Amino acid sequence: MERLLLLDAKDYDEDMDEFVRIAVRGIVFISNRLLLIEDNKGEVKLPGGGQDEGESDSDTLIREIREDTGYSVIPDTIRPFGYIEEKRRDFKSYHEGRIFHQISRLYFCEVSDERGETQLSEQEKQYGMRTALYTLDEAIAKNRAMLDNVGELAWNQREYRTLLLIKEHIENGGVS
């Protein structure tokens, strides 16, 4: 899988311990709108999340999209797009003093028409996470506005840059 982007804050010492997280995220279009997760502040992100030990990328993608959105991925539609790599000093207290190194693997896929219940974590519920559908341009504008208003939070910058890469891919004739 091709690396699409490296976001390296370079705010850490090279000799620090490293916490590596593998995430898998889905790029799903429904009637020309992108399937996203939106919080109560209006921030949007691709559905997906951390890979459990022993899980394949496909298994993680299927599980995470079902949990986040209630939709079921059609397995034979899964197509790799690339990955985003992030490195920065970990800001979570239980990993403080470590390098946070995340690799987000991105896949295009399709979902079935029927939608079930979401299975959000308590933290996701507290943030008011819900399923949303926006055009790609609307999603880019929402995250650009968040960057302008809130500043460059790590995941928001990742999501914004990812959406721009998806747009560039589609405009250059790539499959969505």
Feature annotation, model-predicted:
Residues 44, 115-176:
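Nudix hydrolase/Nudix homology domain
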Residues 1-26, 31:
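Acidic, metal-coordinating catalytic segment for phosphate/diphosphate chemistry
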Residues 33-34, 43:
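Structural motif
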Residues 45-49:
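A short gly/proline-enriched turn/hairpin at secondary-structure junctions
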Residues 28, 36, 108-109:
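Conserved hydrophobic "DFG−1" position in protein kinase catalytic cores
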Residues 51-79, 84-145:
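Unchanged
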Residues 19-21, 29, 99-102, 126-128, ...:
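A generic fold-level signal
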